[in-house]
Amino acid sequence: MDVKTLKGFKDYLPKDSLIRIHIVKQIFSVLNSYNFDLIDTPVLEYSELLLKKSGDESEKQIYRFKDHGGRDVSMRFDLTIPFARFVATNISDLKFPFRRSQFGKVFRGENSQKGRYREFMQFDFDIVGEDGFRADAEILSVVYYGLEEIFLNFIEGINKKFIIHYSHLGILNSFFEKLGIKEESIFILRNIDKIDKIGIDKVKEALLLKIEKEAVDSILSLVNLQGAFKDKIQALKSILGDNESVKRVEDVYRHLSLLKIQDSFNLNLKISGGLDYYTGIVFESEVFGSNMGSVCSGGRYDNLVSSYSSSIQKVSGVGGSFGVDRIKDIIDLEQFSYIKIFVTKARSKVLIVNLDSALQNYYYELATRFRNHDYSKVKNISCEVYFKNKNGKNIKEQIEYALNKEIRFLVFVGQEEYKENKIKVRDLTKKEELLLSFEEVINVIKCNEKLLCTPF
């Protein structure tokens, strides 16, 4: 029997899972600060629903089959289309504007490689029921603060590790209309989106199959606008005149400037979202030096929800998706090893060393006190008792176990400590050992949470 995993699918060992949880927790903390509400949707949906707005590329990659009841079903390839179905299904129970967050696995039958899998986790966030520019800007600010939290850019001395590219499909569509080729807009956008992947020459070659050379040259010149934001806006105004989409981009930029985060954003007209349901702002996020593609992308989709129900009026939406597993692969790169140090040191885990067979019950009572010392459960300490007791003759074995699990604190209680109601605690990162009361041990562990601010 072949016991290896399928191509594009993988197991996650504890250390890998720890990094994934770090990513999810950091994103969740940001979304929670913005009042996003967590939801969930099924992994399986009717194929007709998923294929309706997926685009040709996604249709080729979808896992589709007949279930035991003969129904044509597919595994979700993203979380956005199932969310649009969710809104259409539950619209009477939702209060708009609705801020949604959701994380879960999605499935795509694409060529697997580093940073690209057939099963992977996404963390999505959306605002539906609001079509103003501030909703666009708020989504972009979530991307910024989410990546800042993940890559610890809030710590002094750690430089920004990412750039967020954004565009507006209305700008491109206005230009196509001016050139008299609006009917080919989907074809053009799909190819423009591939410029950074396959190169401008191959994209030009593909565009020339349907578009005149003069128009192709004009398009490629537009999407390669260079300079500062104000220079690009000035160029767009000279080409398109008074244009609503250009004004929208200006308004979004002003909002980002209000937050003093505008320097992490780049107006990049090569970005088109890659999916047919986008209608306005679109964005992708790049981590410097990773060469793994976008780690968070999304955009505005004003017609998606209403396409699933004839009784629903237009429900505007804008959102994005963090690629949890791709971000995890980037953190595996050597230049991001500081994050692993941070995550490991931030875990105040305890191992109670099993020294004395006569103190077995006490050890488990003590472990319960560590786990439950904080009534809110928020700041409780992860703790376990080493199972095997050899009356102190296997201490080396227990320390090796702690090191392997990256447990930071060892607790020793022998007969002498027990009689004095004291605990001996050893910090494995400092090779430091102290004899303390239970309350003092808690304080020592909690004081070491300062490492959350200085992980080195």
From Swiss-Prot:
Membership in a protein family: Belongs to the class-II aminoacyl-tRNA synthetase family.
Entry keyword set: Aminoacyl-tRNA synthetase, ATP-binding, Cytoplasm, Ligase, Nucleotide-binding, Protein biosynthesis
Protein name: Histidine--tRNA ligase
A biological process term (GO) from this entry: histidyl-tRNA aminoacylation
GO cellular component terms, A-Z: cytoplasm
Compartments (UniProt record): Cytoplasm
Domain of life: Bacteria
UniProt cross-references to PANTHER family, sorted A to Z: HISTIDINE--TRNA LIGASE, HISTIDYL-TRNA SYNTHETASE
GO molecular function, one term: histidine-tRNA ligase activity
Subunit structure: Homodimer.
Organism: Borrelia garinii subsp. bavariensis (strain ATCC BAA-2496 / DSM 23469 / PBi) (Borreliella bavariensis)
